[in-house]
Amino acid sequence: METKGYHSLPEGLDMERRWGQVSQAVERSSLGPTERTDENNYMEIVNVSCVSGAIPNNSTQGSSKEKQELLPCLQQDNNRPGILTSDIKTELESKELSATVAESMGLYMDSVRDADYSYEQQNQQGSMSPAKIYQNVEQLVKFYKGNGHRPSTLSCVNTPLRSFMSDSGSSVNGGVMRAVVKSPIMCHEKSPSVCSPLNMTSSVCSPAGINSVSSTTASFGSFPVHSPITQGTPLTCSPNVENRGSRSHSPAHASNVGSPLSSPLSSMKSSISSPPSHCSVKSPVSSPNNVTLRSSVSSPANINNSRCSVSSPSNTNNRSTLSSPAASTVGSICSPVNNAFSYTASGTSAGSSTLRDVVPSPDTQEKGAQEVPFPKTEEVESAISNGVTGQLNIVQYIKPEPDGAFSSSCLGGNSKINSDSSFSVPIKQESTKHSCSGTSFKGNPTVNPFPFMDGSYFSFMDDKDYYSLSGILGPPVPGFDGNCEGSGFPVGIKQEPDDGSYYPEASIPSSAIVGVNSGGQSFHYRIGAQGTISLSRSARDQSFQHLSSFPPVNTLVESWKSHGDLSSRRSDGYPVLEYIPENVSSSTLRSVSTGSSRPSKICLVCGDEASGCHYGVVTCGSCKVFFKRAVEGQHNYLCAGRNDCIIDKIRRKNCPACRLQKCLQAGMNLGARKSKKLGKLKGIHEEQPQQQQPPPPPPPPQSPEEGTTYIAPAKEPSVNTALVPQLSTISRALTPSPVMVLENIEPEIVYAGYDSSKPDTAENLLSTLNRLAGKQMIQVVKWAKVLPGFKNLPLEDQITLIQYSWMCLSSFALSWRSYKHTNSQFLYFAPDLVFNEEKMHQSAMYELCQGMHQISLQFVRLQLTFEEYTIMKVLLLLSTIPKDGLKSQAAFEEMRTNYIKELRKMVTKCPNNSGQSWQRFYQLTKLLDSMHDLVSDLLEFCFYTFRESHALKVEFPAMLVEIISDQLPKVESGNAKPLYFHRK
């Protein structure tokens, strides 16, 4: 005797349109574990009943283990009204109907099994005639008609039961052609009942006996709900949802659905996983041949637990499994509005490619059976929109993944997947243009998850900005006027709250630092392979950072007066300064004490992990000691090779001569000292508190339960005695001078990318120098953009000044590097490109190299300081203008006059120039005048190689091509006007 258990799940009214949202009521019929025989071993009845209402929070209609949470991707508004208006039958009547259908299906399954067995016996002799199968179906129909007891309340046109059988002659190599059925809602001509399960049985079997489809439907009241295998649409549903029917695929696409195995020898219950189509994921492949499975992967609506049989691993593509996108579109979930187990409705798909695939059969046509077309979905090209809401609601593919959490697979929504969900594997949403997020179904506007990736704010990341002066310069930013309210950050980047830190660049990661210059400043340029430079911060944040970060002195005074008990506050382990306001964070104290961001961790000599900045260069401890011993010991090392040995962590001790040469090329100098930012302010912090205050007593013992470090309170200074002189000193220290600004914005030395393996021909050397000049010009443009006062000029004047002075700036910087790194013995173009006498001759510009070398020797004679060099460099930027003048000539004259005054002031402050300041100022200005004569010769040679670049095989980067193309006609026409200090 069979024992049948029914498990009811809640289900909404509009199952067709709200398949993925409403709760479901699925009744399953299962046999007792002790009474399974060969006849009922694979029998399963799936009846679906509809229950009105939305999703209840606490449902009591079924076991809680049978509930299935809805997918976040398919979640919709629960307040949408249902579309059915018919009355709903009680659940008791549904159970009685299910029991009747179960008994009826037993006879039907026996009939189909007999047909399958007969095929196995006749398969060796030939194909089985479909007449016998057709007669079995007619007998079943008569049986159902005789046992009909409940008419349907739906009024529709009666349609005879039709089945379509394909001929065995159309099978090639065992491949069976496709058998299709138009709709599972098929009624007998003489029966007044419509959509009753007694009139709804359709059996489709191909002559090869592999593909057979059975479907069962149930009519509850006036709303027929079908099994997911033969999903249909009643007449009361929306007209834009087409009737669905069972689809029996060929062996290359699908397996038997809802039918027993064609051969009892390969019967089994375990599901298999097919590599081509991922039919099931619960168990491994059991047999490469005919396998019958019991699918364990349910649909999102939890009603697709139907029986499937698979012919071969390559054919395991049935409806009840989640198949891969490449193998099938039947198992893919199409839309939360349209049924998840049926094809897309042709009436609602705009632009979708839907074809009618009809397979002709001679034998069937002889028997009078009509061919019923079935929509064959080839490819979904556009999203299917609901006729009511117009929302995009396609999730094209559901892909089983072996790992990962399901909650991270879909976007949007607050729904969670219950542990009792019938999905046994996570579902991954494919990143296609039809993919959906939770916000799409709720009608919310789509939000860009990456708002800062606008593209217009990253001017340095565009191709036009790599080689465009106007693109790099951009609109003006807050300059030297001390405007603290300027928006240094672009609109597309989130601004961090100002915590009063003096140096925002202290938060830049050390990976962004390329190195330090001879003065010790760290710069945060990233240099790419093509010579392009991208900043770690936005390019529009390159204005003078000190001005926008220093709070005004009067603001500090007001904050100090408002906090009387300055000494009673506690810091986070750092000493408390008497006059530091309370709102200054510990990060400010760290930035003041350190003075600059942490240097890079890579040694610039051998590539080992750097221990700090030694002798002006970020190096490791080994190279530091080696350089000190080599220079102080005055060793004369000789290279056994060609002075191009590889110096790295492993081979740095092989050749001391090449190692010392690389140390010099990196800029190591025994006299170099790393300058600290706000060094004067640091000295004030270290000296004045110690002079005015007695040493504090030792801190009290720390309690074991407390984790704070106690700082002894310092004596509060008197407002009339101590605070006033300190305020005057602080105000002077917090007011940055232009010289301090120029020191901090000085760019880093770039590498030329010189390939020592190539011969040192004139073509190779000149091409390398041009590429280096292109990289340096990008730095010059970025340096000019943050130059105090330069952004006050119109953009046209900025571009004109850079175009006229680029050669002068490059040669002057070359002389400075040669002076600092080689004491003007060589031309220090880059750390990897140093010209000696031999390379000067090989470059075909020996006389020009000698002229630049003479400028470097003048630096040695004058013992030029870094402060003087930075101001003179700005004056060279402002030393050549058009004959007709600039667009804003008054602003240009004012800026140039201010920097001349700064140079005069710097010369006067220098202690070595006491009594001789005017003489030194004269020498420095004469040196600036001599640069014009050298630059005129350099430009003449550059223009010649630029014209004959193809013949000479000399390469020019795009930045130089733009500058030279604009500058060449102006210079040759005599439009350039150099500005001299000592000439008329």
From Swiss-Prot:
It holds the Pfam family zf-C4. Residues 782-785 are annotated as: Important for coactivator binding. Residues 669-725 are annotated as: Hinge. Changing C942S: Abolishes steroid binding and transcription transactivation. Disulfide bonds: none annotated. The modification Phosphoserine is found at S250, S259, S283, S287, S299. GO terms for cellular component: chromatin; cytosol; endoplasmic reticulum membrane; nucleoplasm; nucleus; receptor complex. InterPro entries: NHR-like_dom_sf, Nucl_hrmn_rcpt_lig-bd, Nuclear_hormone_rcpt_NR3, Znf_hrmn_rcpt, Znf_NHR/GATA. Changing L924P: In PHA1A; abolishes transcription transactivation upon aldosterone binding. It is a peripheral membrane protein. SUPFAM superfamilies: Glucocorticoid receptor-like (DNA-binding domain) (SSF57716), Nuclear receptor ligand-binding domain (SSF48508). Coiled coil: none annotated. The keyword Hydrolase does not apply. It is found in: Cytoplasm; Nucleus; Endoplasmic reticulum membrane. Residues 231-329, 347-373, 684-710 are annotated as: Disordered. Zn(2+) 1 binds at C603, C606, C620, C623. One of its GO terms (molecular function) is TBP-class protein binding. Composed of three domains: a modulating N-terminal domain, a DNA-binding domain and a C-terminal ligand-binding domain. Belongs to the nuclear hormone receptor family. NR3 subfamily. This is Mineralocorticoid receptor. It comes from Homo sapiens. The lineage of its organism: Eukaryota, Metazoa, Chordata, Craniata, Vertebrata. The gene is NR3C2.
